[in-house]
Amino acid sequence: MAETAASRTGSVARKTNETSISVSVNLDGTGKSKISTGVGFFDHMLDQLSRHSLIDMEIEAKGDLHIDDHHTVEDTGIAIGQAISKALGDRRGITRYASIDLAMDETMTKAAVDLSGRPFLVWNVAFSAPKIGTFDTELVREFFQALAQNAGITLHLLNHYGANNHHIAETCFKAVARALRTATEIDPRQAGRVPSTKGTLV
């Protein structure tokens, strides 16, 4: 088991004309994070993602924030997704599936994940305002689209109800975190097998 845990890490360095991003993850962590993207609300959400998934994350992003937050948020999602995919390897022994209905005050959001290697996002979340502070609410979807695409995750997000846009965004991140926490765990009954009748998830 110790050998498996030691191997479940992934690092990515991604540099474009718009952003420079480095990400390291440990799937068998305790939810420790060191995050700096230059976007305060986004840092707060990524801290929730790490803390509630128990995936250790180190994220440093420098982007063209003088234009807007879009490239930084999307490219960070790409890099986190790629790092998680590396950490999962051939995905042997993982639980694979998980879902949760997560409550926060007046808000309830459902996340369901399948670490299938087949990226797909179903997004049923609506915000009542274009911004949370200075953060564009449309970027929440952009982040999860990038994450799912690059981690090889089928991800469904459904906001059942909620009035506070901060709470809606935060429950999306926390629900995905809790689902990832379960889905990435090693199932001892799998005995190192790939959890698919096809014999592969990549």
From Swiss-Prot:
Its GO CC terms are: cytoplasm
Reaction(s) catalysed by this chain, per the record, are: D-erythro-1-(imidazol-4-yl)glycerol 3-phosphate = 3-(imidazol-4-yl)-2-oxopropyl phosphate + H2O
* Alphabetical keyword list: Amino-acid biosynthesis, Cytoplasm, Histidine biosynthesis, Lyase
The Gene Ontology biological process annotation of the record reads: L-histidine biosynthetic process
TM ranges: none
Tell me which PROSITE patterns the record gives. Answer: IGP_DEHYDRATASE_1, IGP_DEHYDRATASE_2
Question: Could you tell me the EC number(s) of this protein?
Answer: 4.2.1.19
Please give the Gene Ontology molecular function terms for this protein.
imidazoleglycerol-phosphate dehydratase activity
Q: Which NCBIfam families match?
A: PRK00951.1-5, PRK00951.2-1, PRK00951.2-4
User: Could you say which protein family the record assigns here?
Assistant: Belongs to the imidazoleglycerol-phosphate dehydratase family.
Protein name, UniProt field = Imidazoleglycerol-phosphate dehydratase
* Source organism of this protein record: Rhizobium etli (strain ATCC 51251 / DSM 11541 / JCM 21823 / NBRC 15573 / CFN 42)
Underlying gene: hisB
